[in-house]
Amino acid sequence: MRIALNARFLIEGKMEGIGYSCWEIYRRMIELNPQHTFILFFDRPYSTVFTTFKNVIPVVISPPARHPFLWLIWFEWSIPRALKKWQADVFFSHDGFTSLKTTIPVFLTIHDLAFLAFPKQVPFLVHYFYKIFTPLYLKINFM
C-alpha cells in the first residue's frame, strides 16, 4: 500500500505540539509497517531526520502552506495532483486539514478545536478558514 502523509509540520528544530504529535505517530507507523511505502508530502525543504527509513519517499509540494490562501492552494490543488502523481492509496493528514477534491480514502485527525472556544485568540483569516473548512472536512468520505 502507498500511504501519503501530510508532513508540512515536520520542521526540524521548530516543532511544537502538533509537529511532535505528528512525527511520533508517523514514525511508529513507518517503523511498524515496512511492507508499505510512505510518501511524506512536505511544503518546504525538509530535514533528512524524517526520511531515513527505506520505505519513505519525501516529496516537496509547492507552495509553502503557511497562510490561509496558501492552505487552500496546497490542499485543493497541489495535494490532489500529488496524490495522483504518486499513486497514493490513502491520505493521512494530522493537522486537521485535508483536500475536498481527493478521490482516495482520507484519514484525518484534528489536533485541537481552540478556534471554537477562543475565537479572538486566532487571527481573523485563520479563524474564518477554520470556521468554513473544518465542517466541510468532517463531512467528506473518510476511510
What are these regions (language model features)?
Residues M1-M143:
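Carbohydrate transferase catalytic cores enriched for Leloir-type hexosyltransferases
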